[in-house]
UniProtKB/Swiss-Prot annotation:
NAD(+) binds at residues 269-283. GO terms for cellular component: cytosol. GO terms for biological process: tRNA methylation; tRNA wobble uridine modification. FAD binds at G10, G11, G12, H13, A14, G15, V122, S177, Q366. This is tRNA uridine 5-carboxymethylaminomethyl modification enzyme MnmG. Homodimer. Heterotetramer of two MnmE and two MnmG subunits. It is found in: Cytoplasm. NAD-binding protein involved in the addition of a carboxymethylaminomethyl (cmnm) group at the wobble position (U34) of certain tRNAs, forming tRNA-cmnm(5)s(2)U34. The gene is mnmG. GO terms for molecular function: flavin adenine dinucleotide binding. Belongs to the MnmG family. Keywords: Cytoplasm, FAD, Flavoprotein, NAD, tRNA processing. Pfam families: GIDA (PF01134), GIDA_C_1st (PF21680), SAM_GIDA_C (PF13932). Disulfide bonds: none annotated.
Amino acid sequence: MQKYDVIVIGGGHAGVEAAAASARLGVSTLLITPKSENLGEMSCNPAIGGIAKGTLVKEIDALDGLMGYVIDQAGIHYKMLNETRGPAVWGPRAQADRKLYKKAMYQILTNYPNLEILYAKVEDIEIKSSEIKAVILNNGSKIPCQKIILTTGTFLSGLIHIGSKKIPAGRVDEEPSYGLSNTLRRIGFKLSRLKTGTPPRIDGRTIDYSKVESQPGDKVPRPFSELTDNVNVPQINCFVTKTTTETHNVIRANLDKSAMYSGQIEGIGPRYCPSIEDKIVRFSTKSEHRIFLEPEGVDDHTIYPNGISTSLPEEVQHQLIKTIPGLENAIILRPGYAIEYDYIDPREISSTLETKKITGLYFAGQINGTTGYEEAAGQGIVAGINAALAVKNQPPFILTRANSYIGVMIDDLTSFGTLEPYRMFTSRSEYRLSIRADNADLRLTEMGISIGVISEKRKEIFTIKCKNIESTKSLLNTLCLTTSKLAKMGIQVAQDGTYKTVLDLFKIPNFDVEQAIKIFPVLKNVDNNILQLLYIEAKYASYLVRQYADINLFQSEEAQLIPKNIDYFKIPSISLEIQEKLSYNKPITIVAARRIPGVTPAAITAIIIYLKTKYNDRRST
């Protein structure tokens, strides 16, 4: 059997990004997944992006990942969320045509250099002396490899719940993986349970659209990927309805039949994506909850009713659907359900996503306690890059809180772990003014180029964009008007007799790109995305100065690497409790050590002094 450098187990959103990233770095990569038709499957809602999540997608794209480009081949309803608020919290989002998304993903992966795909099931992993040796398929055959990336999604001992009915499955009509759960336990990983859910799917032909509110997308779709010039997929509307008092009464009368409330489910569900049962119980004073009716495709009559995830019995689901305006005669095509699955404590992995127990074993996606396609994909690309770099004996690729949302997510997980499905939010980032969706490529693409994970095409596009930014910035600094002339135009500026450039004007409240173009028509010929970027940078300029100072302080501590072989028990001024925490978590930088709960500032000072006296420098050994 051929030996591979990297084997990725699982073809979901984490798996496809991991496999593609590994292959881009030139190492032989094998992606193992049960079915060809499920590559990049959208198991839950047919959408990519959102608040914070959209920034994750842009970061994946900046590292030459797949998700942003694929959604641009399948997006049927683009919407910039939070646009009435500051640019730091804007959330690009797009509804997807499920069929087009899978088709585009399949076409890319099956033609990817250095990547092979095997449609099979993995039963076990062969490990010797705490190092990866091979994967073992369910037919007993072995495939040798150097590195393994586990991206198992909800398949680890997956169990679907519909009322009192239990169905062993990783997804509808797909078998779970018990073998890999057993493997992880045998290795010594502690497995816990999480839960997620999905709503019933509805036949759109049976909806009364006169009773629901139409929700159009943006007039001009803004692509996710820097590789996309224009979105050519037909755009369609979504719709909004809401629950009623009658809906709530049906749910309350049947709470004891819900798998969530009968005690049948052990796993903890996502706090910020609660089931409809949870909403009725936790927000009992609310008389209604919004439901977004999302088409699953241009030529697909299936509707995803976002907002009514449930584990109620199927017959109760039929009752509650008929109490919702516009859905009185709606037909359910597939019932909603909850699904439980195993995950590991993400403090068992490092910031490269390699496990601390086993050299060459990486975890990405829901196995680490996250929820969401974008969170999974962000981990997948990092795991794929690091597995390939390790094969090539090159330094690891570390994203930090200061340069990316992906870095924030990984740092949160590896520092604190999680007891519930982790979802990304803008509020999790202390540097969100500088790590926005609009500048993801400026933050990360150069890093990707330096390690060789960026294609020549993207490199060329990035180089041209950087030159255009500089030339546009020069133009904006050249175009100017006197304060008196601006006052005559109704623009409120201090009358100090000076000239104000366009970049100066961008700092004025309520002055925007459209006004600049009206005053200086030459700007019509400039790339609007670049104008928006420079507008945002100018608008935030004074805040960014302070934030960059904070980032510099962070990076100085981030640069203080802690040797892998450090013995914390030899630092006498640190308490035994803190020594044990540091030994367990194995932080690789001073910043990581500082973020471990219970590690005091005095302990950090003691570590820094110890490193200076023991190693006489800041380099890892």
